[in-house]
UniProtKB/Swiss-Prot annotation:
Signal sequence annotation: none
UniProt-listed GO biological process terms: pseudouridine synthesis; tRNA pseudouridine synthesis
Domain of life: Archaea
Upper lineage: Archaea, Methanobacteriati, Methanobacteriota, Methanomada group, Methanococci
Protein name: Probable tRNA pseudouridine synthase D 1
Gene coding for it: truD1
Biological role stated in the UniProt entry: Could be responsible for synthesis of pseudouridine from uracil-13 in transfer RNAs.
Reactions accelerated catalytically: uridine(13) in tRNA = pseudouridine(13) in tRNA
PROSITE patterns in the record: TRUD, UPF0024
Presence of the UniProt keyword Disulfide bond in the record: no
Active site: 92
Length: 392
């Protein structure tokens, strides 16, 4: 089940390697007010005069941490649960990233004492508001591409052509599906079909080439249904796999094993399946181009595609035909997206092309650096694929 990303806007490419080191991929959050949270730079955020003592915001700079793991570790250090913390969006793990984080009922002096390798907390602000998912304008990306296949004048010509791109195909990037284990959408499809056993084995079992030796052995044991031994063999870092296996051993129910996951993680599986089908919608629309056509539903004057749910708003015209054909092929119905206690998924629409802001590059030795800004919800890897993937 590939990730449905196979169309390109140009025939130019440079080749190359990204993320050799975390410092090669810098993600700096841009606040709703347009402030770029620059790596290594302190910014003053003024305290609210009528502070009621509830919320504190801070900038989290992290290296080689997921956002969720970083916040979980910070919460542990200050003696609070993760639910006391809020953030606007997840940032890449194998990268250097910045973002604002809000916390409730946490003492400032406790936050200021936190010292964790790869994590810096700064720019504290006393405020009366939460930070919710989506509370950002977007992100600035500074990405080093190492060992490009093209050199000298050829490289410069390709970069000049590619950097003229104003838009990109707004695919959901590989992070949506799992960078090392791109199976999240497969789990989601099993859940939509109410095949809880298949979903359990896809998530906890099903060894893949990039799995390390210990987790690969544990996943093989899951597929053999030797769950007690699999639980012992999974490294403790595989927190959710271990919890799910334990829940299955205790209850004998694959569905109940999924219910021990936090709501945001349960949502992730269905969202990934929706995203997988959305990527296919882009591929199907590609042959018609992305100029608005009769029947399109526009977002910011750009044609949008469906993220299927229990209240899917279909386009009409050619775009509507594409969406309904995929929906019917998958044997979907509104009720499929109402999954009881697991969650309900209303559906949405998403622009099929995204705008690139302030794109520039510079060449250094055997690498080049790209810098650009994207609005929230857009993936840098969907821009990068135009640069580094060979277009056959």
């Amino acid at each position: 089940m590939p990730l449905n990303m196979n169309k390109y806007l140009t025939d130019a490419y440079t080749g190359g390697i990204i993320k050799k080191y975390p410092e090669d991929f810098i993600v700096e959050e841009i606040t709703p007010e347009g402030i770029i949270l620059e790596v290594g730079k302190s910014i003053e955020f003024k305290d609210e005069e009528n502070w009621k003592g509830n919320y504190i915001h801070f900038t989290l700079e992290k290296r080689n941490w997921t956002t969720l793991d970083a916040i979980r570790e910070i919460a542990n250090r200050v003696g609070k649960q993760r639910k006391h913390f809020g953030f606007a969006g997840n940032k890449d793990k194998y990268a250097v990233t910045t973002q604002r984080v809000g916390c409730f009922n946490v003492k400032l002096e406790d936050l200021m004492k936190v010292k964790i390798k790869g994590i810096i907390l700064r720019d504290f602000q006393k405020t009366n508001r939460k930070i919710r998912l989506g509370d950002l304008w977007g992100n600035r990306f500074t990405i080093r591409v190492r060992e490009p296949e093209l050199k000298g004048k050829e490289l410069e010509e390709a970069l000049n052509k590619l950097c003229k791109l104003k838009y990109f195909l707004n695919y959901y990037g590989v992070q949506r599906f799992g960078t090392t284990r791109p199976i999240t959408h497969i789990v989601g499809r099993f859940i939509i079909e109410r095949d809880w056993e298949g979903a359990f084995h896809a998530y906890c079992g099903t060894p893949l080439p990039y799995d390390d030796k210990k987790s690969k052995l544990a996943r093989e044991l899951v597929d053999e249904e030797n769950f007690k031994e699999a639980y012992k063999k999974f490294p403790k870092a595989f927190f959710y796999e271990r919890r799910m296996i334990k829940a299955y051993i205790e209850t004998g129910s694959y569905q109940k094993a999924f219910m021990i996951l936090p709501p945001y993680l349960r949502c992730m599986f269905i969202n990934a399946y929706q995203s997988y089908l959305f990527n296919e919608i882009i591929n199907r629309r590609f042959e018609y181009g992305f100029e608005p056509m009769e029947g399109d539903i526009l977002i910011d004057n750009v044609p949008s595609g469906a993220l299927f749910g229990y209240k899917t708003r279909f386009a009409s015209g050619i775009q509507g035909e594409i969406e309904r054909e995929i929906y019917e092929r998958e044997n979907l119905s509104p009720e499929d997206f109402k999954i009881g206690e697991f969650g309900s998924f209303i559906g949405d629409r998403r622009a099929m092309i995204g705008k690139i802001y302030n794109m520039k590059y510079w060449i250094e030795d055997d690498s080049y650096v790209l810098q650009f800004c994207l609005k929230k919800g857009n993936y840098a890897t969907s821009v990068l694929r135009e640069f580094i993937e060979k277009k056959d």
